[in-house]
Amino acid sequence: RELFDFQASDSVVSIAHRAAYRRILAAGVKCVHIGSVDDNVVPLYSALFSCAAHPSILRAVYVDGIAFPQKDFLIMLIALCVLIRNCGFHDHNLLTLLSASVAGPLYTGQGHTNLYLEPRVYDMATQYLFETYSPKSSGASEVPLVGMPYAPQRWNSYELPWSLRGLLEDSVIRHFFMKDIRIMIKDYAAWTPTSKKLKDLQRRLAPMSTVRVPTEPSDMKDEPSDADEDDPFLPAMVLHPRAKL
């Protein structure tokens, strides 16, 4: 029963979980949350603990390289949301709404098992432990854990286009992720989903095609160049012949 009680932020077990989470973050612990987009057991928003924000939390998405297409608009959009969260910015709740909209298996439903068997899942946690600053020395351990209240079965699918529009027109997001937004708009135009669930999602994401983006860099300093990275989603999804994180 406790497993289902986690679906409400005001349940006894959820409150106790957040209190324990705050204690380990204050002690300087780094946390890694990796979720599978093809998991028929654990929703992505739950696996990624998307309701919480803290600089010591790193998130990543596992994508089975065999089950999924080489390039999938939905996967890349989810990866962009994870990247935005990892950079410490607000994703306008798009990650949670997207994962709630596609809860359950999208292709094979094997992601829940394969996630635990993928060596790079553990490699990422090890790299995050040893290759980033200590939360104690950087001051991250003194930052409070910020949480968003939630309740079971309260997802409103009509919030999705508003959330998407808010993200794409956020001046901070447009400044740092303009290259990625341009890619997303092009990929959406070429997206041809086949299942009813994904076709419904495509219709709700229709505002993507109406967003206007500048063709020239903005006047803000230090805007990332299109030549900065070969893969704009590398921090959120590491490419691998077998799988992607």
Predicted regions and their residues:
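Lipid deacylating catalytic domains
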Residues: 1-245
